Amino acid sequence: MLLHGIFPPITTPFYPDGNVYFKKLESNVERYSRTPCAGIVVLGSTGEAILLSDQERRDVLKTAHQAAAPNKVLIAGTGVESAIETLRLTEYAAELGYDIAMVRTPHYYKKQMTAASILAFYRTVADRSPLPVIIYNFPQATGYDIPAELVIELAEHPNLIGIKESSGDVEKVRKMVEGTRHIQRSVTVTETFEAVTPRMFAAATGGSSGEGGELVQVGVLAGASSSSSLAKPSSAAVSI
């Protein structure tokens, strides 16, 4: 599988008391569904998945799936510290009809996050997952940065189709791309650069860019007030 297009990671809206605002979530997903985006990422870091209970995660996945347009590719953030719990949530996402699982690196026991442990975790998930799996590396949040060498090794697994690389390390991305060229699958890299992103977000709401895409302000698209730091919006998605 080779992913094409833009996949915005949606927020999870809350009431002031901390409960999930499901009607607003439904409205937000419907708005995203009316954009040219190829799909939607549910329960990523922006979706605050790590702060939700297992039942809340399931309810968010269900609500988002029901509200999404049928032509959108849906990516479910299903990664937790346990491989077994990750698989349970992934299986639920598959039952709902999600297309891909995005699994963050486990990180709580950092001293135990050896190469062997990471390989075992992702291979266990990939072996049993009913969905294709994307590795999610976000060292700024987890404190663990999966080495490029491990990603290259994991790329050999047919059910591991890519990585969301949020370290901002362009050299690492280059190394991963070069290291997976031998694999008989397509490879694509999409990067968000600091010099481009602020200009894109500054575009008029609903306006058309001469470079080929409709640009919608994040606050309008989300349907709720939000604040976004554009200081270092650098990340890359690599499909392998």
Name each region found by the language model:
Residues 124-128, 139-240:
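Catalytic alpha/beta core domains of metabolic enzymes, predominantly
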